[in-house]
C-alpha cells in the first residue's frame, strides 16, 4: 500500500512540475511574440493585447487543471480501492 501512495505522490509532483514548466514556456513565448508584433505594428497593439490576455487565461487554466488532478490523486486516491 505504501508503494502505491508513494508512486501516486511522485506522479503528482511530476505532473505539477511539467504543468508549471509548460505554462512558463507558454507565457514567455506569448509575451515575446506580443512584444514583437506590437513593435512591428503599433496600431494593432490594443487588439493584440486583448487576444494575448485571452490566451494567457487559457494557459493559466492548464496549470489549474493539473493542480486539480494532482489533488484528486493525493487526497482521494482511486488506486487504493483496487487493493482489496
From Swiss-Prot:
It is found in: Cell inner membrane. GO terms for molecular function: lipid binding; proton-transporting ATP synthase activity, rotational mechanism. Keywords: ATP synthesis, Cell inner membrane, Cell membrane, CF(0), Hydrogen ion transport, Ion transport, Lipid-binding, Membrane, Transmembrane, Transmembrane helix, Transport. It is a multi-pass membrane protein. Belongs to the ATPase C chain family. F-type ATPases have 2 components, F(1) - the catalytic core - and F(0) - the membrane proton channel. F(1) has five subunits: alpha(3), beta(3), gamma(1), delta(1), epsilon(1). F(0) has three main subunits: a(1), b(2) and c(10-14). The alpha and beta chains form an alternating ring which encloses part of the gamma chain. F(1) is attached to F(0) by a central stalk formed by the gamma and epsilon chains, while a peripheral stalk is formed by the delta and b chains. F(1)F(0) ATP synthase produces ATP from ADP in the presence of a proton or sodium gradient. F-type ATPases consist of two structural domains, F(1) containing the extramembraneous catalytic core and F(0) containing the membrane proton channel, linked together by a central stalk and a peripheral stalk. During catalysis, ATP synthesis in the catalytic domain of F(1) is coupled via a rotary mechanism of the central stalk subunits to proton translocation. NCBIfam families: ATP_synt_c, PRK06876.1. This is ATP synthase subunit c. It comes from Histophilus somni (strain 129Pt).
